Amino acid sequence: MAARKAKHAFRSQATQSDAERQDLDSKLAAVLESRGNANAVFDILEHLESKKEDVVQAAIRTTSKLFEVLLEKRELYIGDLPAEDDSPPDTCSAEDKYKMWMRNRYNSCVSCLLDLLQYSSFSVQELVLCTLMKFIQLEGKFPLENSEWRDSYRFPRELLKFVVDNLLQEEADCTLLITRFQEYLEYDDVRYYTMTVTTECVSRIQQKNKQVLPPVFQTNVFCLLSSINMPVEESTLGNFLVTKNENHEEWKPSKLKEQKRVFERVWMSFLKHQLSVSLYKKVLLILHESILPHMSKPSLMIDFLTAAYDVGGAISLLALNGLFILIHQHNLEYPDFYKKLYSLLEPSVFHVKYRARFFHLANLFLSSTHLPVYLVAAFAKRLARLALTAPPQVLLMIIPFICNLIRRHPACRVLIHRPSAGDLVTDPYIMEEQDPAKSQALESCLWELEVLQQHYHGDVVRAANVISRALSAQESDVSGLLEMSSCELFDKEMKKKFKSVPLEYEPVRGLLGLKSDITAEHFTF
């Protein structure tokens, strides 16, 4: 019985929704047919506040059709719109009064649509976003302002500002809707003005929250900025949402220099604030490919990168990429850079997610033959000491890495050919010293590599045995070893085919067992 009632209620609601949609269609036709039916616009807008999702969607589509026609027919007042509560001037004609009234209805519609960007259903949010962007396109084609721009090219910046402000919420996560908005960022004019209004939004929220950006707001801003695909050449600019026949060569969005300027400005306004650790990592991961190449002055990022480099841990590792670009491509200096890089060599560096990236960059930074011998020796010695507790897949990369350092700097060969090398107790190297210049590494030797010649893994033993022979001048290629995992190493071992199966750690010799057996020493069988 209850199921039958529920089914009946559902059918009743569906019938009612169909009736409301038909009512919307009839009112739309009536408004477009005669100005005498203009008051029906109120009924159409009222449906935007319906509690039924399908009715809300129907109302959104109806308002889109309605104001698209009215904008094309120039049925909305053009110019500075007086406040709705104020009486229109006596000089206003009936035509102007009607257009003012309809312009106010359009503004009310836009206001309702902006509120619906926070609707519970994503399908409604998406439909609203597309409708508002359609209005932006129409306002650009049929401007509602009288002001003459220098190049006769208008863009409804104010409406876009309202849209972006609603995407960059302080408390609501809008990343899904921002991802949908990414499609419009492919338009050069939308991209340019989005970056401009985002800068203003960040500044406004900063002042409102006493120089602090709320975490959710930070996430929304990053999602928006990371969705921007910047053009590389000016010749590719020309894909505009708002199209005009006039020449737009002098228009700022059509200039790559101006695009870079606002891109740089919006990122700098965002990154000057304290970010969460997770957001720091996300920014640093895309910095070298998606941000620095598109900035007018990449050197402005030095403060952000040095601050990130000083944080420690994975964030410092990720900051290396950006610093490498600034140091090698833009000739920027970083005091105590190698001292900081040296301090990052901790046991945890072998287990972090970004290990391969770190050692790739460390290899680049240590590739110069002009580095002081004591510095290279300190890096080689510290890596060798850390190798004593490293897993085998890391050792297969670390040992060739150390050997390459010695090959580049022949003066460091003393580390593997020191005849007066003492034991572990007399090793002069100071592991706890953070300054490589004071670590006394050059007075030590790489006895750690000799220890690794007794490692349980055969490949590690073969790699460590290199120091027992004359070291070749040709460097080893470690690029293929940087990302080796324990699973890959295990799979490699599983594929090996052995001629004999080892049954004992020490193979039995003779009938009486091991060679060291007391019986075998006196009897031979």
UniProtKB/Swiss-Prot annotation:
It is a multi-pass membrane protein. Residues 1-10 have a biased composition (Basic residues). It is found in: Nucleus membrane; Nucleus, Nucleolus. InterPro entries: ARM-type_fold, CCAAT-binding_factor, Noc4. Residues 1-21 are annotated as: Disordered. Keywords: Membrane, Nucleus, Transmembrane, Transmembrane helix. GO terms for biological process: ribosome biogenesis. The chain crosses the membrane at residues 307-327, 358-378, 386-406. One of its GO terms (cellular component) is nuclear membrane. It holds the Pfam family CBF. Belongs to the CBF/MAK21 family. This is Nucleolar complex protein 4 homolog B. It comes from Xenopus laevis.
